[in-house]
Amino acid sequence: MLVAVVKELKQGEGRVACTPENVRKLTAAGHKVIVEKNAGIGSGFSNDMYEKEGAKIVTHEQAWEADLVIKVKEPHESEYQYFKKNQIIWGFLHLASSKEIVEKMQGVGVIAISGETIIKNGKAELLAPMSAIAGQRSAIMGAYYSEAQHGGQGTLVTGVHENVDIPGSTYVIFGGGVAATNAANVALGLNAKVIIIELNDDRIKYLEDMYAEKDVTVVKSTPENLAEQIKKADVFISTILIPGAKPPKLVTREMVKSMKKGSVLIDIAIDQGGTIETIRPTTISDPVYEEEGVIHYGVPNQPGAVPRTSTMALAQGNIDYILEICDKGLEQAIKDNEALSAGVNIYQGQETNQGLATSHDLDYKEILNVIE
């Protein structure tokens, strides 16, 4: 199987899906690897580093000739022309956010594996480290855009407690998963007050125990509680994600209108469509806009802004699955690995992820029934 590591085209995306160490593991197992020129530069990996581990450096077009194309994010529109039947495309594809790319993949017969839907022991194994990074960075961005020079309220999130008592900011975090707790931990480190809105009762108890000694309030998620708590936010971070599916717009325009003027609103799951009615995707170089008097931050690839850290985490999670596909062939790997099978979103024209199929009103079939 010919494996290609391609350079990301998404604006501001510095990550690469495979490190030189991963290439060494693949070539040592007898697999041929090609790497697009400068694919790893943003993460600190030179072309020479890949070549030393057995990869061949190729052009963008040549990379897309591979049987297995390893990416970080979804293909750019300019790359749709390279799709071919039975080609495996691997990455955080977030296909629920775009019916166009789904139709392109379906029409050609591409096999799409989305890392965010690989679920092992009930957890999104590959997505978790990226969620942690996005959560931490969101808390930092909330502090940054609270400054007056960026259109914020002009507040210092830490407050001031030297001979005076000026309170810090209030972070309201929607959702209680990995991204949420990482955002909360950074906010607490900045001396902010944190309110977490969570639906699951067991998770609420877990969060209450985790933060028993901290300035954290955990609130049951209901539309009424969300509407009440969002008014308190200096920084509001939505972390709600339904793996493979497009989430509902739970934060309405009316709720956004009720927020403090100059407060900051961040949607970590904007790459899947987001849960905020007024949010739209932005870029790392142009990350914010103002609507209803609130600063909106909608960057869909936040880990791409810290590629040296996030690439190492991403590649460490990827490699065992990629090796299994290459060693066994995709169909056998799917049969042997339940977590991997959950990652297959499209197989030779058929939607095999129920959340994706529901999001675009398409026919769904279970992957094991398709490959039999």
From Swiss-Prot:
Family designation: Belongs to the AlaDH/PNT family.
One Pfam assignment: AlaDh_PNT_C
One term under GO cellular component: plasma membrane
Name listed for the protein in its UniProt record: Alanine dehydrogenase 1
Coiled-coil stretches: none
InterPro entries assigned to the protein according to its UniProt record, in alphabetical order: Ala_DH, Ala_DH/PNT_CS2, AlaDH/PNT_N, AlaDH/PNT_NAD(H)-bd, NAD(P)-bd_dom_sf
Record's catalysed reaction(s): L-alanine + NAD(+) + H2O = pyruvate + NH4(+) + NADH + H(+)
EC assignment: 1.4.1.1
Active-site positions on this chain: H94
Keyword Transmembrane helix found: no
Single GO MF annotation: alanine dehydrogenase activity
Enzyme class: oxidoreductase
GO biological process, one term: L-alanine catabolic process
Species in which this protein is naturally found: Staphylococcus aureus (strain bovine RF122 / ET3-1)
Alphabetical UniProt keywords: NAD, Oxidoreductase
Described purpose of this protein according to its UniProt entry: May play a role in cell wall synthesis as L-alanine is an important constituent of the peptidoglycan layer.
Residues that coordinate or bind NAD(+): 170-200
Pathway participation: Amino-acid degradation; L-alanine degradation via dehydrogenase pathway; NH(3) and pyruvate from L-alanine: step 1/1
Keyword NAD carried by entry: yes
